[in-house]
Swiss-Prot record:
Ca(2+) binds at T53, D68. This is Peroxidase. Its EC number is 1.11.1.7. The keyword Transmembrane helix does not apply. Keywords: Calcium, Heme, Hydrogen peroxide, Iron, Metal-binding, Oxidoreductase, Peroxidase, Secreted. The keyword Ligase does not apply.
Amino acid sequence: LSPTFYATSXPNVXXTRDSVVEIGQLADTVAPVRGFDVIDNIKDMVALSGSHTIGQARQATRSPAQVDLSNTRGLLGQAGNDFALVDDK
């Protein structure tokens, strides 16, 4: 996976391209499995990371993810520049 855009301009952005890939994959795999309100929170995280929409992130990450769901919250927190935007429902 190699997205053709970069979410930048926010503070403490590290490995942003990989993070956006993880965000897109987690949005597809975690939302139906864990019942998180993922899409709205992902939209906020991507916007905070550089004004990219979840649609762009998901277009760049069409492949299914191999995600360890036990670390889902940690991955989303890291990808969102440590914003705690994902809450259990």
